[in-house]
């Protein structure tokens, strides 16, 4: 069980940072916040997400925090830590919410002061909208929480991350290496966003919205996207994503070839395979 006497600090009160702050506060933890936007900080204060917070002159909040949640983009997290990381006190264990770990975990762990531990994690939840105003809409219960420990992490740090996920409401918690995580994310998350975005960009006929059905809406739900965040995540994980795009393109070309050849058997074979794999996937979904 997490110690409720510990002070938590959320740096970056966006969608996920705001949700962490909300759930921790609801669970009875003392949570402070740091945010660049005064408006979003005030929203978090007024709605009880945080007990206190600042947009600047926040060194004291950092120094007294027992645990920190970084709701920042990877580049911003590294930059922030280079400036303020020395303020973290011995015994502080902190984590992030970033969707990419390669290029982030090793540099931040190398910058940690003595006695400070960074245990990286990824809450695989979110919405098409962003900002703390929509944080309450995020549902952690059906989502996956992935912990990505390295040889520099302690059993206590890993256990803290697991217990944090439980307090936040995650039902499925697992561990992967940094490399495994980024390979997996390239397929199950980033490729899906790449397909949705490409589908929306492939046709500019705005009148199509009058005729679309559920299939189009389902496939393009995630195409309404945070451009700055996803551009950064794509570029940070570009080798894995390019590999997945190539593999997807190969499958699409296989279907195209079947159409050109009027190969009904091949099309039916692909449809059966996708149906079988989707059925198996549905059985494995966490309840």
Roles of regions detected by a PLM:
Residues 1-62, 67:
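NAD(P)+-binding Rossmann beta1-loop-alpha1 motif at the extreme N-terminus of oxidoreductases
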Residues 4-7, 91, 142:
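Phosphate-coordination loops involved in phosphoryl transfer and adenosine-cofactor binding
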Residues 7, 30-32, 117, 144, ...:
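Residues at the starts of beta-strands that form the adenosine-phosphate
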Residues 36, 72-73, 97:
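Short beta->alpha hinge that forms the Motif I/post-I loop of the SAM-binding pocket
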Residues 58-88, 92-93:
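Rossmann-like NAD(P)-binding element
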Residues 80-133:
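Rossmann-like NAD(P)(H) cofactor-binding subdomain of soluble oxidoreductases
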